[in-house]
Amino acid sequence: MTAPRLRRAAFGFSLIELLVSMVIALVVTIAISTVMVRSEGSKRATTSVNDVNQAGTYIAYVLDRTIRSAGSGYAQRWSDTFGCKIDASKSGTAVLPLPTAAATPFAHMPQTFRLAPVLIGQGKADEGTSVRGDVLTIMGGTSGSGEVPQSVASVTGTTVRLPNTLGYQPDTSGQYNHLVLLADKTAAGCLLEQVSGKPTSDTLSLGNTYFKTTGSLVSVTSFGATSMAVQLGTDAVNPPQFTMYGVGDNSTLYSYELLQMINTGSVPVADGVIEMRALYGVDNTTPLDGTPDTWVSPASGSGYSQEELTDGSPGAQTRLRRIVAVRVGFIMRTSLQERASERFSGGAAPSSMTLTLFGDLGTGLSKTRTITGDGLLYRYRTIEFTVPLRNVMLAPTS
């Protein structure tokens, strides 16, 4: 008799169970991957926006500090100094007027500059069809003492005699390398010179890097008892701020040092900037009270274009004195190009969008930029701030 064969219990998974578990695992994997991709995309977008915000804050700090000091050293005698053509040389070579046109984004700026606290060159940074906005030119001394120009008693080829030289103290390195701007209504320009050695009680000896007897426009002997001496600072330790700012290639804000104290050529300040605009705050009160009564565009024909403010006329000089504030606006763009599905909630980009600067001032003064195409896949920020011209506000009314 054959014994019955015992049946073993089945172990493992059936084919159906395996397929079901694979489907569940695949769904979970897709869900986790989707969450991670969206999380990383959000993280990249947040980081990119934070970078733009930090760059905007830094730009606002740099320009606020520079503009607030505009006019330092010479604004108190604006009727003698505003609008004079600047003549400067370094190591015997002409620096101003510029020997050749500056590089982009300052290629459309003039080669001859007139002394003014702030000038706005409307559209001067634009290059071809690329709209980049305005160029800001800011001029101010940094001496920290002797902020009021002194009357000149007499001038020779290598000396300038003043009522006193108390403001010409050694810098932190113990050197007497003060920069002096000689200005006179009757001269063809104002001449930058440099002190050489410790001055006597009333006389400055001229020499060093920024000394030249005869410049491109005027010579030392063009000045005399009717002239003014403006102390601007020193060339190394505390150089004056005669600087242009404009948006150039690669969405970068550049600066250009007119006197070439430290840098030559265009120097990047911050990236992520695609456009810069500015307006003048003008005091129209008679007598002047130091408060901006209206905002004025630097457009041609307004009386406040760069060309009209630097034509050397008494009217231009008076208008420069009326400028007591500057309002600056930037359009910032992130460096990250996002997918349309991540950038827009509906998953599809609109045909265009607009960004507006100075929108509260109305259509006559506001600036609008239209974004289309791939530009819609970036994120943008607009930054605006107003800076008072302290040295001009405190200057005499006449």
Where are these regions (language model features)?
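Structural signal for terminal/edge beta-strands and the immediately following C-terminal loop/tail
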Residues: 382-398
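N-terminal pilin/flagellin-like segments and related low-complexity appendage regions
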Residues: 59-325, 329, 335-379, 396-398
